[in-house]
Amino acid sequence: MTFADVFDLQMGKTPSRDISSYWSGDNVWVSIADMKDRKYVDSSKETISDEAIKATGIREVPEGTVFMSFKLSIGKVAIAAKNLYTNEAIMQFPIKPGYELSPEYLYYYLLGHKWQGANKAVMGATLNKKKIAQEHISFPSIEEQQRIVDELDLLTGIIDKKNAQLRDLDALAQSIFYEMFGDPNANSLNWPSSSFKDIFKLKSGDGLKEKDFVTGQFPVYGGNGISGYHNAFNKEGKHIIIGRVGAYCGNVRVVEDCFWLTDNAFDAFFDSSVLDYYFASWLLNTLVLHRFANHAAQPVISNSGLKDLLIILPPIEIQRHFSERVLAILQQKSSISNSIIDVKMLLSERMDAYFS
């Protein structure tokens, strides 16, 4: 059987952003960013109006339908927890009558499926509806599907619990930050301060075209974190990098050793005798730089958008004390993250055994 035999494949749409009334409704409209680490989706960052639905003819995704990203980021999968809508980068897999196929089984099947003919690039990959329709699929009895789902749910449950531990540690670090420094947006403890433009100089990295990309050992950082591994690097040592472009632009992290920084991210230069790296990273994330992004279809932050942002400057000794406490938390996070990798490897092995 092919996917075309089993599924009534459908894509979503994006209403015109030039008509503000299209974006003032309460209908859930899912983009790839809304699918991050969520098996069931019932909400979205953006919503659309009934007027937009009528004007575009966008089809509703019924509750229980499985859907998957197939452009830019292939293979993010979720199940609709309520009736909703999606954009055109997401394929929907309504099951045709006559096929006993569990949505939960299909969820794992799509996560584990190796897509033929996917055009994988440095910063993303693409499929199309024709390629998806031509893929072959087979599945066992509904009872065997449930047994497989139960096993894989057990492993994903372990991963979810460990991710919850990571979130708790993040909350602890954030609590320590507020305890020591107050609210940096209001400078509630009246620390000395200066403007962003007087503290930081931002410089974007270097473009990395698909034809120049060679898989290697060095992480490639783009607007949303690591996007791949290259055989060359353009940065070494300790750096603060800030995502410049994309749904998660404004994310801040400390990166050490050798890596490639693309032009979708900034390297933040500053005087390390005035600001500690880990304090500065935590401060900038607490200030939520994403709120200063423009509102184009592809969000972007810039030097000009951040230049007047207030940056608190506590004594460097206090900053370093905070960093020592945070580094201890980061070590705990690293141990948990490594255990998550182990469980994910086991999950991947089991999915390969069932779906390859």
Report residues per predicted region.
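Short, solvent-exposed loop/turn positions at domain surfaces
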Residues: S16-R17, A55, A121, D160, ...
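Non-catalytic DNA-recognition/assembly elements of restriction-modification systems
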Residues: M1-K13, G25, Q134-V149, G157, ...
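Extended, charge-rich, solvent-exposed interface segments
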Residues: M123-G124, N128
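Glycine/small-residue-rich phosphate/adenosyl-binding loop
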Residues: L289
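A short beta-sheet element
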Residues: S31-I32, S49-L111, G222-N285, N294-K307
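DNA target-recognition patches
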Residues: A4-L9, S16-A52, P192-C249
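Hydrophobic pocket-lining residues within nucleotide cofactor-binding pockets
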Residues: M35, I132, L306
